[in-house]
Amino acid sequence: MSSQQFPRQAVSMPPPQVSNSGASVGQNVQGDEVAREIDVQSRDPLGASTVLPSRDDKQEPVVVRPYPQVQMLTSHHPLQPAPSLTMTAQPAHLTSAVPLSFSENILKTPKSTMPSRPIAPAPPSALSAVPKVSGQGTVTMESGLPQTSAIPVATISGQQGHPNSLHHIMAATNVQMSIIRSGAPGPPLHIGASHLPRGAAAAAVMSSSKVTTMLRPASAQIPSAAASQSATQHIIHPPIQSRPPVTTTSVSPAVVATVSATRAQSPVITTTPAHAAEPVLRPTLAFQQHPPPAAISIQRSAQARDAATTRITLPTHPALGGQKPQLHAMTQKTLFGTGNPVAAATVAPILATNTLPSVTTSGSAPHTQVSTSTIVTMTMPTHSSHATAGTASNIPVAKVVPQQITHTSPRIQSEYGTERGNLIPIPGHRASPNPMTMEARSENRQPVPVQLQYFLPTYPPSAYPLTAHTYTPITSSVSTIRQYPVSAQAPNSAITAQSVASTVHLNPMQLINMDTSHTRHIQGIQPAPVSAQGIQPSPFSAQGIQATPISTQGIHPTPINTQAIHPATSITNQGVQTSSVSSQQASSEPKSSVVLAEGATIIANPINSSFSATPAGTTVMQSHSQSPGIGSSPAQGSSPRPSILRKKPATEGLSVRKSLIPPHPGDAVSPRHDSALRSTSASPRPAGAKPKADLHVSVAPGVTGDPGAADQPSAAASLPSSHHPTAAVPSPPSQPVSGPMPSSIHITPATIPALSAPPPLLSNAPSGAVMPEDKMKEEAEPMDILRPVSAVPPLPPNSISSPLTVLANNISGPAGELPPGASPRKKPRKQQHVISTEEGDMMETNSTDEERCHAVKPFTSRPEKRKSPPKEYIDEEGVRYVPVRPRPPITLLRHYRNPWKAAYHHFQRYTDVRVKEEKKLTLQDVANQKGITCRVQGWKTHLCAAQLLQLIKLEQDVFERLTVLQEGLVPKKKTATDDDLHRINELIQGNMQRCKLVMDQITESRDCMLKVLDHKDRVLKLLNKSGASRRLSKVKPKDKM
């Protein structure tokens, strides 16, 4: 998605931001071009050189990321913030600024980090965004994220920024996701204004700035509420800058958070994750803003959270304009303070684990840390954990994260080493179909999980044992399921828990991971604020993972916060923030939610922040899950077979989303669901704006819905959410808020259940989790039907929770369900040489299990409708209505099915044909042939010789007759003078000669032929000899036997 694709609204925003950023300012103004350049630069130079060296082992595989540099992040954790810087787009202008933003530490790291991944995902626009980021510490943060995740995430985020742009963003997100998945796209992920639609960019910027500010002033600001506010303000301006960083570094959660608003949800998410992770990984890394750099562990996180909170608020308010001040002012801060760990945890889980995105990178921690403070907030919100604290801003981040995860996954993997890799693969395994997935797929890319980067574990890095249980769940969920418990990753145990959350970031495919993260989150993080989310009664508790509306709605929650300051507070308090979310949604555009839902999931959040589409954020998270990931796929680009997946939207959608339909236009929902179901990863995009509304609904409601409804809605909503991302955001901003709410709520319950469920899985999850589990399972089931991995996608509506749910399902309930659909992508292909005779079969060959499941369900529901057409009736006026069945146009083609039988009778390739090698007969073989003695006698030869004799006799007869004729003519001397006689004579003579010649030759041939029989005796002798021996030899072995 080049920056061109989206208007550079954010860019305009930048100037204010710039001020914050300082160096950034110029860049922002400059616009995409500069950003692009920077992107390129960072990507190429930094990414290639810096990143690469760093993480040779696994990260290289990370290459999957479109942004190789980021991959390079291989340097992984250590991810130097430098890469972050690059991310920022600082490259050109920001560079200096970035240092400013980050503390010295961060600065160091950033360079290397930046290249890591940040750059790749973002399109050129991202670059522009980078400039915005420029000044930001964010950038540095990002660099921490650089692992990979960040970039993708950021991208998404940015896109989400605008409701209308949503589609674009979605596209961008998808693209970016694709990039991430494929690793092909070079463009850095910088989430830049360019990337985002104008509106989105602006919003992102605002959101971002909050984060950014934090990063920059970080130490001072974060500590106090006042500082917080201040930071918020600053952030607003630098948001873009921040975001780019985000983009750059999924790892730096802090940065990401900021970014979310501005440019890429991805970055935003990243930011938060980074932050969260950072504390665990590298308190030191924490931004200067985090005074507690010392505490690698949670402490840092907490502070960061505070900062993040503030920041978040800011982003929120930017989106909301009026609200923002309030938001960021105290509420946000409080949130963070209260749940700061939560936010961090969310992000950190994966990150902390090892990757926390880059930040997590222990070595890189410095820069990461920087991001941490800011990011934490952001990311968390995305998931549920953060939702409360930094929801607004963070949420966007979360959104981003999903994508990011994809990118990150490789990085994270790296960071985590093998285990990490596994983690990521889980998400990735599904990813295979979708790019995102890819990310996960590349086991190298451990960072994926990091993407979530929920910091939750951050504060409880040591405290929680999330490591082990946390990761495992994730894996399960993913299906890939590398069950590596995060425990392996234990190093960042706290983060590990978060990691799960991190997973959320994953794209559709990674969604599962995300879920897992969440679950983990819940488990690992529960004790802390995360607990609140999943475990803590506090703010997050309500939703469980989802509780933090932030998580599910987390994303929206944040936006909500942003949009409504009080909502933000609400979030903190409620954790679930149901009300807050609702109000928010009503007030702000639910679209945000939607946007994020799909691959854009991450984006949505950022957008939310900016646009106050908080709900969307949540959804988004889930959405990415869609890819099932494998589905996955998460982004449309990532989706393995987007076209195929999109084929049956109507049918599939319908079946799944019962609840959704009522709230939103059935058709919007239906398609959306379809899409989501069909291809969690790719489908979403196709969904139109309407879907967005649906999505929105899902998300918003995510807070706490009816369990029953949740199930259905969940499934429906989640699917939609994935679809919505694109369409959702733009179209239903206003409508969704009020209308969707109910639906949303329903869905939310589902999410919550899901969320809860995961905790049960984790076992850490305290209470609520269990109940949700039931729902979750139900939800999962529908999902499963849709597609095993789908389980996750359905959750999307709940976004964070949902993912968890899905994970839980996958892990627990889904285990059973998976078999049928098991890994959709892994479905055994039909043997190539067997060509099905039925069209249906052929279709199945290309379709995934998920698809099939979807088809089944939807079909069952639809057929019923079709079977019972309206019966004829007579109305009050006596008018008789007879149902007329619309007749399809008459076509010969309609009944034509391409039978593939022809393939059976034609060679498809050279290897299908092989020349038969004739076997040379041995004497024994010849001797043992039937009638060999008869043949030796030469009867055929004699027969032929007799016939030749007849020919000779015939020729002789002709010769004699010609002689007589000639003799009759010659005597007359007139022949010489008579031309005719002369000619006849000549002819006779010629014929006589021919007869002689033929007779001689035939005789000769006959003699030669008969000579063959001269050896008859000898041949018979040999044959009798060898023939006998052969028979004996055949008999002997039998005797021996």
From Swiss-Prot:
Residues 18-30, 614-641 have a biased composition (Polar residues). It comes from Xenopus laevis. Keywords: Nucleus, Repressor, Transcription, Transcription regulation. This is Histone deacetylase complex subunit SAP130-B. Belongs to the SAP130 family. GO terms for cellular component: Sin3-type complex. Residues 1-62, 111-131, 572-592, 614-769, 806-852 are annotated as: Disordered. One of its GO terms (biological process) is negative regulation of transcription by RNA polymerase II. PANTHER family: HISTONE DEACETYLASE COMPLEX SUBUNIT SAP130 (PTHR13497:SF3). It comes from the Eukaryota.
